[in-house]
């Protein structure tokens, strides 16, 4: 299992551990991932994801999973999230109401 966010693709990053004497040693920073089920109100479906805490906070801030997908550019999303975004866009085009 890779430690990558299923929505944004955010993975581990690299940096330095700096000691008191200012010596630097390489280290990795892992992403804080959670297994969550997100509900799409427009599609009336549930989706299971492995999502980072940062992405969860952003989804709450944007007003829900559907609004997050609609208001986020496709190049910031993974392929899996882009497919769901396309489904949501098609449902909105057919006349399903988007509630805030």
Curated annotation (Swiss-Prot):
Region listing for Disordered, in residue ranges: 1-21
Q: List keywords of the entry alphabetically.
A: Ribonucleoprotein, Ribosomal protein
GO MF annotations for this entry? structural constituent of ribosome
Biased composition (Polar residues) is annotated at: 10-19
Annotated Gene Ontology cellular components are:
cytosolic large ribosomal subunit
Source taxon at top rank: Bacteria
Q: Biological process GO terms, please?
A: translation
Pfam short name (any one): Ribosomal_L28
Q: Which family does it belong to?
A: Belongs to the bacterial ribosomal protein bL28 family.
Protein name in the entry: Large ribosomal subunit protein bL28
The species this protein was found in: Ehrlichia canis (strain Jake)
Q: What is the lineage of its organism?
A: Bacteria, Pseudomonadati, Pseudomonadota, Alphaproteobacteria, Rickettsiales
